[in-house]
Amino acid sequence: MQRRDDPASRLTRSSGRSCSKDPSGAHPSVRLTPSRPSPLPHRPRGGGGGPRGGARASPATQPPPLLPPSTPGPDATVVGSAPTPLLPPSATAAVKMEPENKYLPELMAEKDSLDPSFTHAMQLLSVEIEKIQKGESKKDDEENYLDLFSHKNMKLKERVLIPVKQYPKFNFVGKILGPQGNTIKRLQEETGAKISVLGKGSMRDKAKEEELRKGGDPKYAHLNMDLHVFIEVFGPPCEAYALMAHAMEEVKKFLVPDMMDDICQEQFLELSYLNGVPEPSRGRGVSVRGRGAAPPPPPVPRGRGVGPPRGALVRGTPVRGSITRGATVTRGVPPPPTVRGAPTPRARTAGIQRIPLPPTPAPETYEDYGYDDTYAEQSYEGYEGYYSQSQGESEYYDYGHGELQDSYEAYGQDDWNGTRPSLKAPPARPVKGAYREHPYGRY
């Protein structure tokens, strides 16, 4: 009976029932840990005899149960480190724009505080401020792809350096521009690109160039650069790059320091033509002809090597011009080695006076032959006598006449062997005149 009425044991039982039967406690996960030993059997020993021992065994003093890491607790935002909240895209863009928004005021403040004597720094700051205001830095980052199938035109710019440091004495600017700028105009028409010479030394007036350089005008900012050729091309991507390549290849020809190439020679001829000088072909011809000794005033207006008309002197045979066929001097002197080879008589008009040259002894065979004398003396007489005797005879029309054959044979033997005592023509020679009436009389 004493154990039933013991207040300590009664309090212990009541506390054990409340922990096991209360389903809506502060820690509902106590049910998930059944392997945890209950502290009820140990409490009577440590706190027996008074109500304080029962108060220590209250559930408020128990440690909190362990939770799995994936299960958030009701106070997750308070206990532990809080996660970074997600920002909307507009807020992210604003965060990215903050450096640029700060960069622009800094540049403007630095430009205002900078001394105006620093012209280059002022120009660089102005260019950078303009890029940020226009947003060109963003465009350069975004436009990294080319659409080859679109018909959208693009603009290409290239600067080709002129080697003035390697060749300081050569006038590259004059070679590229040409007389009155005609060369660079033709180059632009051929390549389809806009070509200009820019940089230090591109202007003829050095004082004006220095003044414009110090003026700080953005239009003349190129005067602070090295001397170069600026090429601009506008068109579709494929066509633009092709035009740029062609233009650079043509400009490369003008960067060769050679004054005797075809480009410079054409420019010299064009310059002489613009200045009113006669045609270059005539000037060249005069200089070439003046190398030899000029003859005394020739009657023929033609130049060297072209003598009088094509009769007696051009071929070097004066016999054809005015000498009769019976002249033995020309027959005895072989003309080709003495007259035809020499260039001097070809340019002289008075070649007939050179006929009485010292004759050399000719061979006897040529002197005995003398068929020219027979033609001049007895050719017509033989023809007349033959016509008077043979007009009435019809036997001369026979093709196989014996007298005709004998006459031809006698002529050939006596003529070439030189055995004829007289210098008369053979009788068969005049037969040609009679046979002209018949078409077959020659055979």
Swiss-Prot record:
The modification Phosphothreonine is found at residues 33, 71, 84, 183. Residues 171-197 form the KH domain. Residues 81-94, 283-293, 307-316 have a biased composition (Low complexity). It is found in: Nucleus; Cytoplasm; Membrane. Residues 100-260 are annotated as: Involved in homodimerization. Residues 61-72 have a biased composition (Pro residues). Residues 351-443 are annotated as: Interaction with HNRNPA1. The modification Phosphotyrosine is found at residues 387, 435, 440, 443. Keywords: Acetylation, Cell cycle, Cytoplasm, Isopeptide bond, Membrane, Methylation, mRNA processing, Nucleus, Phosphoprotein, RNA-binding, SH3-binding, Transcription, Transcription regulation, Ubl conjugation. Residues 434-443 have a biased composition (Basic and acidic residues). The modification Phosphoserine is found at residues 18, 20, 29, 58, 113, 150, 390. Tyrosine phosphorylated by several non-receptor tyrosine kinases including LCK, FYN and JAK3. Also tyrosine phosphorylated by the non-receptor tyrosine kinase SRMS in an EGF-dependent manner. Phosphorylation by PTK6 negatively regulates its RNA binding ability. Phosphorylation by PTK6 at Tyr-440 dictates the nuclear localization of KHDRBS1. Phosphorylation by MAPK1 at Ser-58, Thr-71 and Thr-84 regulates CD44 alternative splicing by promoting CD44 exon v5 inclusion. The modification Dimethylated arginine is found at residues 320, 331, 340. CDD domains: KH-I_KHDRBS1. SUPFAM superfamilies: Eukaryotic type KH-domain (KH-domain type I). The modification Omega-N-methylarginine is found at residues 282, 284, 291, 310, 315, 320, 325, 331, 340. There is a cross-link at residues 96, 102, 139, 175, 432 (Glycyl lysine isopeptide (Lys-Gly) (interchain with G-Cter in SUMO2)). The modification Asymmetric dimethylarginine is found at residues 45, 52, 304, 331. GO terms for cellular component: cytoplasm; Grb2-Sos complex; membrane; nucleoplasm; nucleus. In adult cerebellum expressed in most neuronal cell populations, specifically in cerebellar granule cells of the internal granular layer, ROR(alpha)-positive Purkinje cells, internal granular layer and molecular layer interneurons (at protein level). Gene3D superfamilies: K Homology domain, type 1. Recruited and tyrosine phosphorylated by several receptor systems, for example the T-cell, leptin and insulin receptors. Once phosphorylated, functions as an adapter protein in signal transduction cascades by binding to SH2 and SH3 domain-containing proteins. Role in G2-M progression in the cell cycle. Represses CBP-dependent transcriptional activation apparently by competing with other nuclear factors for binding to CBP. Also acts as a putative regulator of mRNA stability and/or translation rates and mediates mRNA nuclear export. The KH domain is required for binding to RNA. Self-associates to form homooligomers when bound to RNA, oligomerization appears to be limited when binding to proteins. Forms a trimeric complex in the nucleus consisting of BANP, HDAC6 and KHDRBS1/SAM68; HDAC6 keeps KHDRBS1 in a deacetylated state which inhibits the inclusion of CD44 alternate exons. The complex is disrupted by MAPK1/MAPK3-mediated phosphorylation of BANP which results in BANP export to the cytoplasm. This facilitates acetylation of KHDRBS1 and CD44 variant exon inclusion. This is KH domain-containing, RNA-binding, signal transduction-associated protein 1. It comes from Mus musculus (Mouse). The lineage of its organism: Eukaryota, Metazoa, Chordata, Craniata, Vertebrata.
